[in-house]
């Protein structure tokens, strides 16, 4: 006899019970890119079965996913949780002015309390939209507060404090010596890398070439490579003005400067790449360096449109990221999915330049590959971690036609997400956060955002 079938959102469903996601369209993103009508059986933190699932004898929590896509959770490979409080405070400025006039003063004004509130705001937004893994770059100080917020939220994440030991216009609150920067990064790595049963990882984060000495870049590379699984995370080739400033200061481009210091290779994730030349793409591909496409941020800061089609053709591995709230202003993966697909078509004057499936891959399995964790997440396959999102496909904005993948990329929005699991844990159920109080997050963000702005005198 079959065991009892208990609804997943029931107050009486025992924690730790198996979960069966029943009757959805499963968008696996596996090597065969299968899209199948199937059930997904979760046990603990693992995907146990995909197919026709009989309820286990000991019972299961059941989610009715009819009319929904069951997909891997989104993997965002470049975000700034520390900037979530700054939404709407830095609009309509180009990159370097945006940094010097708004972002750096605001970051310098953070204290531990405001940074914690900022991280919770960004995490809540992304989790509700189906994001299950992030690569985050923090600000210079108080980064334990970010890791604490991530740990409490249930998000899978790599994160690291920003490293800055030089730069024009850097406020006092962001200034640090090379020794201080490396020592604090090492302390954070020792404390947080591998924490939460491996759900958290560390990424050394030299901000960009203009804010880091050669000594700091080399030190970050050496430190990252000394510990398995630790990443390097920076910005590169984002804006023409930035590239000119680097050439004026160093006599070479930022990609050359990073490569000379060891900030390349399979454990390096660089954001943007808008200004990359073809020869640089080929060299980065040979080195195995990963990149993140941030289409909305690149548009808002007038950086340009990254040639993602050329990057992928050169052999580069590219993920997707919303970047930060003050340069987007959303942290919504559905926005980035759609933008990535549409902008590739415009960049190439070719409607077929990027298919919906390719865009979805960047936001899921390719994002996991960028972070080196594709053996564990990024696709729905038996034995992988239970990181998934359930997304309604029956909204008026998605009907009446189109396959599940096309609907996810071109039609769906964040509010279509009903459930999110990370490591088998229900983080979002029926559109509501289970790990964070959304109302408290919003109210605290309003209060702390006002305090930061006053301290920054903006």
Regions from the language model: what does each represent?
Residues 260-267, 309-395, 411:
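His/Asp/Glu-enriched, well-ordered alpha-helical/loop segment
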Residues 154-156, 221-229, 263-266, 283-292, ...:
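Glycine-enriched alpha-helix->loop->beta-strand junction motifs that scaffold or abut catalytic
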Residues 24, 40, 45, 67, ...:
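Divalent metal-coordination and catalytic microenvironments
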Residues 85-117, 158-179, 240-267, 287-290, ...:
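Active-site gating loops and adjacent loop-to-helix segments of metal-dependent hydrolytic enzymes
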Residues 87-155, 181-197, 446-454:
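Alpha-helical scaffold segments that flank or form the walls of functional sites
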Residues 146-274:
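Metal-coordinating catalytic core of metallo-dependent amide/deamination hydrolases
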Residues 1-38, 43-48, 53, 364-458:
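Active-site microenvironment of metallo-dependent hydrolases
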């Amino acid at each position: 006899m079959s065991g009892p079938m208990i609804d997943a959102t029931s107050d009486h469903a025992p924690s730790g019970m198996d979960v069966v996601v029943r009757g959805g369209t499963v968008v696996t993103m596996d090597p065969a890119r299968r899209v199948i009508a199937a059930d997904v059986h979760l046990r603990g933190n693992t995907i146990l079965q995909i197919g026709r699932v009989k309820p286990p004898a000991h019972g299961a929590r059941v989610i009715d996913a009819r009319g929904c896509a069951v997909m891997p959770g989104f993997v965002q490979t470049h975000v700034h949780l520390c900037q979530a409080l700054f939404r709407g405070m830095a609009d309509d400025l180009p990159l370097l002015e945006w940094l010097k006039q708004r972002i750096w003063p605001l970051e310098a004004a953070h204290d531990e309390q405001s940074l914690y509130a900022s991280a919770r705001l960004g995490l809540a937004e992304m989790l509700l939209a189906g994001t299950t893994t992030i690569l985050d770059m923090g600000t210079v100080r108080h980064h334990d507060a970010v890791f604490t917020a991530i740990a409490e939220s249930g998000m899978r994440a790599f994160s690291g404090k920003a490293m800055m030991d030089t730069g024009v216009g850097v406020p006092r609150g962001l200034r640090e010596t090379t020794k201080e920067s490396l020592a604090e990064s090492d302390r954070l790595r020792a404390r947080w890398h591998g924490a939460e049963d491996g759900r958290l990882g560390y990424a050394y984060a030299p901000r960009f070439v203009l804010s880091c000495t050669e000594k700091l870049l080399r030190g970050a590379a050496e430190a990252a490579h000394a510990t398995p699984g630790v990443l390097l995370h920076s910005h590169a080739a984002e804006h023409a003005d930035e590239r000119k400033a680097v050439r004026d200061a160093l006599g070479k481009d930022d990609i050359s400067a990073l490569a000379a210091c060891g900030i390349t290779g399979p454990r390096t994730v660089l954001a943007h790449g808008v200004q990359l030349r073809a020869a640089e793409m080929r060299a980065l591909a040979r080195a195995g360096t990963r990149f993140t496409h941030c289409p909305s941020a690149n548009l808002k800061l007038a950086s340009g449109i990254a040639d993602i089609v050329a990057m992928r053709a050169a052999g580069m591995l590219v993920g997707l990221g919303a970047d930060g709230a003050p340069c987007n202003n959303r942290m919504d993966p559905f926005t980035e999915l759609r933008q990535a697909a549409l902008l590739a078509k415009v960049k190439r004057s070719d409607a077929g330049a990027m298919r919906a499936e390719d865009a979805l891959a960047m936001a899921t399995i390719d994002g996991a590959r960028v972070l080196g964790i594709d053996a564990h997440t990024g696709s729905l396959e038996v034995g992988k971690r239970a990181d998934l999102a359930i997304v309604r496909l029956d909204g008026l904005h998605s009907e009446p036609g189109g396959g599940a993948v096309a609907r996810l990329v071109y039609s769906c929005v964040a509010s279509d997400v009903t459930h999110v699991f990370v490591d088998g844990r229900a983080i979002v159920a029926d559109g509501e956060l289970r790990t964070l109080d959304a109302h408290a997050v919003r109210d605290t963000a309003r209060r702390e955002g006002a305090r930061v702005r006053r301290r920054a005198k903006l």
